[in-house]
Amino acid sequence: MVKQIMIQGTASDAGKSVLVAGLCRLFKNKGKRVVPFKSQNMSLNSFITATGDEMGRAQVFQAEAAGVFPDVRMNPVLLKPTNDRQSQVIFMGAILDNMDAVTYHDFKQTLIPKIQAVYQSLADENDIIVLEGAGSPAEINLNDRDIVNMGMAKMVDAPVVLVADIDKGGVFASIYGTIMLLNEEERARIKGVIINKFRGDVALLQPGIDMIEELTNVPVIGVIPYANLQLEEEDSVSLSGKNYVPDSNALLDIAIICLPRISNFTDFHSLEIQPEISLRYIRNLADFGKPDLVIIPGSKNTLEDMAFLEESGLKKAIQNFAENAGKVIGICGGYQMLGKKMLDPNQVESKQLEIAGLGLLDTETIFLDQKRTTQITGVTHSGEAVEGYEIHMGETKRGESTSPFCEIKAVNGNEETHQDGAISVNKNIIGTYIHGIFDNDVFLGNLFDELLTRKNKSVYPHEIINLKEHKEQEYDKLAALLEANIQMDQLEKIMKGEKICVSTQKPAIKE
């Protein structure tokens, strides 16, 4: 019979996703067949599986940590906000509809038996399932129809460990408030608490641990030290802490336009881990500076984000940058914005029927009702072999003054040839639908060399850090960190359904 443990949090960005990934790697290293599971994920960071199904990126990196291929069953429901009131609802990798919050709140009850069936199919194939909740279980206005926190735990009778982020402050209030806002049945499901991102001497924390255990009668089974691990961040909340000031000591200054509806910002994780590269996010005109490369990322609402560029003055700044021989790369929605105009006659993305683009590429995009979701391999215009994935509802046509960026050779593992993207005559402006393009080492190294040559400097002096190899190392570091700082004997008892009590054995933090 499958063992299970659910990680819920006191808030978004408390560390649930990372903790699930770490536990998956820890159990994998012990020889267990383990998979992650999150019934419903709201995120604009998504991935396309080998079968062409769309799922949340968080469950992808958790699957990697577990040593298994991403499977859409690990995240059956994906919500992708299109604006502040509506989301695209995706079930088992395929679009169902666009729904507002009220409509979806009523609709999601119909998903319960389907979610249960999906979960059971994973349970039949594995030894352990590590479930992840969303946000906080104490959203009392939503709990009557919850399918991702206590509602999910109840569906499969999973024990819960609550994780709280001490780095933001107010950790004991968040633990107590979360637990006390739950009803008696839900409260009984919380078998342990983990305090995350602690800095300092745990002895100073101990009086608070003693008091919170007495107040809640729930044991604190771990205190995880703050660790500077280079892992993908899935939650858009994490963007608020991203750098916007260039590093004057770096070889290259790369600026990403932080769109209001930015999607798939995990595309830039490969850039973040490279030595002597300054990666920053531009939120307004004052942040623009003098970058060596500007990247316009993907967007879940390209037309509205294009309007943001116009209103903020960033449109003119990007155009001026390009006119002065600046290098600009657009990914997916960013590619669409580089063109002359975008048309949305069926109002697929917004109520705007048409909007002018940046005009840096001789292209036009029309939005269609059908989404393209594929994994691809191909060869770029300069001969680099690349792989990645596509997620878009737009069809972009190139004009005569552009050439294709990439010749696609295979789609979802099957031989299929077509052209992707566009390049300007002077080669300074590139647009592509390929997410993950920067994860290709040769392409990235050549890009760095080109940018440095433009500055009359020698080629990039470092070997490109391979993202897959780097992540494997980070997953192992994370697993070791958790094993050293969680009372694993207590966690094992929780997973077996054994009762554990508040004890005198206190967590001792280990680096």
Swiss-Prot record:
Keyword Amino-acid biosynthesis in record: no
Coiled coil region boundaries: none
Residue numbers annotated as active site: C332 (nucleophile), H435
A Pfam family per the record: CbiA
GO terms under biological process: cobalamin biosynthetic process
HAMAP family associated with the record: CobQ
Listed name of the protein: Cobyric acid synthase
